[in-house]
Amino acid sequence: MKLILTAPVAKLGVPGDIVEVKDGYGRNYLLPQNYAIKWTRGAEAQIKDITRARKAKEIKSKEEAEQIRSQLEHLVVQVTVQVGENGRLFGAVTPGDIALAVRKAGGPALEKRSIEITKPIKTIGKHTVGVKLHDAIKGHVTVETVPAA
């Protein structure tokens, strides 16, 4: 099935890309979630518009991403968590928890999808978490987990 992406899809492409996927993946996931539209000749103009808008936004967002990265590098956010007797967390710290903590600490608003946790945070202490700000720009934020009182 030939589709045009309207939203970024991990390991597939960015808006405006023409992709060939299996019928089931297209019909059951990409189309219902509005991540893609069916490819037609008339959609070629739409592809060009999406690509042009993406390039204009990319130039602006690259500069913004550099500024956000410099803000995040100096930021230490605290996440309050429930802890057991042995110092281990009940559950784990999620990307949503980190995004909320960054916002509360006066940092920039981050999407939880942009936060990359390599291994689950299940202990008390300081942890470094990656943040994908742009295709070529990644930042880091320090997350300190503290036990709830």
UniProtKB/Swiss-Prot annotation:
One of its GO terms (molecular function) is rRNA binding. Transmembrane segments: none annotated. GO terms for cellular component: ribonucleoprotein complex; ribosome. The keyword Hydrolase does not apply. The lineage of its organism: Bacteria, Bacillati, Actinomycetota, Actinomycetes, Propionibacteriales. The keyword RNA-binding applies. It comes from the Bacteria. Binds to the 23S rRNA. InterPro entries: Ribosomal_bL9 (IPR000244), Ribosomal_bL9/RNase_H1_N (IPR009027), Ribosomal_bL9_bac/chp (IPR020594), Ribosomal_bL9_C (IPR020069), Ribosomal_bL9_C_sf (IPR036791), Ribosomal_bL9_N (IPR020070), Ribosomal_bL9_N_sf (IPR036935). It comes from Cutibacterium acnes (strain DSM 16379 / KPA171202). It holds the Pfam family Ribosomal_L9_C. This is Large ribosomal subunit protein bL9. Belongs to the bacterial ribosomal protein bL9 family. GO terms for biological process: translation. Keywords: Ribonucleoprotein, Ribosomal protein, RNA-binding, rRNA-binding.
